[in-house]
Amino acid sequence: MATLRVLLSCVRGPLRPPVRCPAWRPFASGANFEYIIAEKRGKNNTVGLIQLNRPKALNALCDGLIDELNQALKIFEEDPAVGAIVLTGGDKAFAAGADIKEMQNLSFQDCYSSKFLKHWDHLTQIKKPVIAAVNGYAFGGGCELAMMCDIIYAGEKAQFAQPEILIGTIPGAGGTQRLTRTVGKSLAMEMVLTGDRISAQDAKQAGLVSKICPVETLVEEAIQCAEKIASNSKIIAAMAKESVNAAFEMTLAEGSKLEKKLFYSTFATNDRKEGMTAFVEKRKANFKDQ
């Protein structure tokens, strides 16, 4: 949640502007974003791509950036052509934490009455699968933001940390909860109590990351995964996502009961019938998201 001066000091040389691939298709939403870039990608524009774009601040998560992120997520969630979303940052940083300047002078009353950081939770309410493509620093709020996503791909030089204790606070956007559920108590406790960072390789070994990619191909590989997801039925993908996420909230018995209920629910969809019929007929399924 914190952007630390000591972390910023480790970056040498001028920051490069975000690299924009010529193949990226413009995001025709009418939205005018200052802190993010939002575009549709994939052969059939089935992937929503959101790039955090505050390079001089290492993508520090100010209120304006989070508001724009939520706007873009809402637009992609409501776009029937989009089946999955990729969230990324820059080569130096996915996001180096929350914007400390916005938090420095807040009181308890300010935080409590305004439900500070509450609007960060919008990402967890998105029904479409979201992939975090993490290059560079994912510290504090940046690590928490990545953990809100459904899948994390990491560049080979990515680093993850919850260093809030070094500035006299604790994670406030799910860091102590999601990290513990993902990597276990011992590693989570060590990271939260020391502020130490872990590498992409350590994160993968701990189960925080599902794939490590070269820095230069990370986003494209995440998009390829998103395209594969988007080729399936959106309504069935949403059910699958709901069932997997329930494993973090329920007992095994409760989760299995929900899974069974969602499994039965697929039999009320045309896509379930089409998928099984296509399998029997040895052809590719033509899902209609119905």
Curated annotation (Swiss-Prot):
UniProt: substrate binding residues: A98, D99, I100, K101, G141
| Residue numbers carrying N6-acetyllysine | K101, K115, K118, K211
The signal peptide here is none
Q: Which UniProt keywords apply?
A: Acetylation, Fatty acid metabolism, Isomerase, Lipid metabolism, Lyase, Mitochondrion, Phosphoprotein, Transit peptide
EC number(s) reported in the record: 4.2.1.17, 5.3.3.8
Instruction: Kindly state one GO CC term assigned in the UniProt record.
Output: mitochondrial matrix
SUPFAM superfamilies under this entry?
ClpP/crotonase
Give a yes or no for keyword ATP-binding in this entry: no
Q: Where is this site: Important for catalytic activity?
A: E164
Question: According to the UniProt entry, which residues carry N6-succinyllysine?
Answer: K101, K115, K204
Pathway field of the UniProt record reads: Lipid metabolism; fatty acid beta-oxidation
Transit peptide start and end: 1-27
Alphabetical list of PROSITE patterns matching this protein: ENOYL_COA_HYDRATASE
Q: Which Pfam families match?
A: ECH_1 (PF00378)
* Reactions mediated catalytically: a (3S)-3-hydroxyacyl-CoA = a (2E)-enoyl-CoA + H2O; a (3E)-enoyl-CoA = a 4-saturated (2E)-enoyl-CoA; (3E)-hexenoyl-CoA = (2E)-hexenoyl-CoA; (3S)-3-hydroxybutanoyl-CoA = (2E)-butenoyl-CoA + H2O
**Residues bearing PTM Phosphoserine:** S114
| GO function terms (MF aspect) | 3-hydroxypropionyl-CoA dehydratase activity; crotonyl-CoA hydratase activity; delta(3)-delta(2)-enoyl-CoA isomerase activity; enoyl-CoA hydratase activity
Name the family: Belongs to the enoyl-CoA hydratase/isomerase family.
Show the PANTHER family listed in the entry: ENOYL-COA HYDRATASE, MITOCHONDRIAL, ENOYL-COA HYDRATASE-RELATED
Name of protein: Enoyl-CoA hydratase, mitochondrial
Q: Which organism does this sequence originate in? A: Pongo abelii (Sumatran orangutan)
